[in-house]
Amino acid sequence: MKHTRPVDRPLRRLRRAASVTAVAAALLAGLAPAAGAAGPEASAARAPSPGRHLDRAALQAGLDAVRDAGVYGVFSAARDGRERFDGASGTADLTTGRPVRADLRHRVGSVTKTFTAVAVLQQNAKGRVDLDRPVGDYVPDLLPGERGRKVTVRMLLNHTSGIEDYIADAFPSLRQGSTTSLDDHRFRTIRPTELIGYGVARPQRFEPGTDWSYSNTNYILLGEILRKVTGQDPERLIAKDVIRRAGLRDTYFPGTDPHIRGAHARMYESFYGLIDPPRDYSIYNMTWGGTAGALVSTPQDLNTFYRALLTGDLLPQRQLDQMRTAYDVKDETGAVVLRYGLGIFSLDTPCGPAWGHDGGVWGAGTIALSSPDGTRQFALGHNLTKYQRLNEAGTAFDPHPADAAMRDYRDQALCGRTAPQAPAKDSIEGPAALSPVLPALTAR
């Protein structure tokens, strides 16, 4: 099968952009929420459609549209009550031509954060973690001094701590607009305390609790709080109390093993044209993601997880309510583009709000969303990332048809229909410095 490569743009445009290293450090980490304005159609239709169901032909056509837009391979699972759809389109391995399957294992990036947040809230229910207690009370050596007294556990969970992300320091070539660190550190093992040290060494982005800024450092700190209060390795704790409790069979932390166990796709990273042709990063030591983004899972497992979470199987009602108490994330015009709770976010769709998370690591992108009552979910993985290109000014991303195709698929999977699309803008606004925001799926 012939694959359409996303439109190439001069690489000098990316390198000359004043904020390129910030964009690189934020976006390509991919352990990031896909924040974006919900668009007019979302506010016009808040209630679920009566009699909606899974239209398998429309869903498969939606996956084919993502492939036709230039993404090498895309695979997904959708559920509505007892109805299920499993579909895939495209290629898992460009060298062999092996096709993707719906049940492939995949690195799911920041979807890990919901799992970590559930584990923290379980400890809150047991009285071991107070969400409004200072982080310094739990791990004083990791967040010392005044910051340790001001930043609370809740602020870590909802990204209002103001603590800087560690990605740009963990992959230092990004600050020079180069991707060489991605290859240099493919087999590196890095300790959680090192990652935290990178983020904490940077100046605060704002006074704790006064603003919002996505930071993977927050969730590595949460892992260390879990270690402190339980005496257990946090990844093993999450495996026992969250993954096994939810009945997930294909979800695990890989630890230092750079290989994914079981069937999976190759994972191709473009990095906005800096890596041309896109390079396979499916073999990678994911200790740099840890409790912020190292999980391997499948679309089917993610649907099962979010259904179990939102129907109350993993948390008491009080903790679930806390989890869905969200901070309104606004753009420069003051419009709410995302509502971020405790390790889970809400965005608008044509049939009302959906809850979940997304993520991406080198070459692997994921989105998993559910209706608020947990009756309908979808999860999608794709194996080409950062295919977008900056505009001529180097300040924003040009619209890419794959993003629109993924939004259409999202709406079909969750709502049984797609929303009318507003005329495309000349470009998609780029993210603020070191504030990860993926343009796919929700940007309009």
Residue ranges and their predicted role:
Residues 146-354:
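Short, surface-exposed loop or secondary-structure junction motifs
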Residues 63, 82, 113-116, 120, ...:
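Residue-level preference for non-acidic, small/hydrophobic
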Residues 2-3, 36-87, 279-444:
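Catalytic loop of the DD-peptidase/beta-lactamase superfamily, centered on the K-T-G motif
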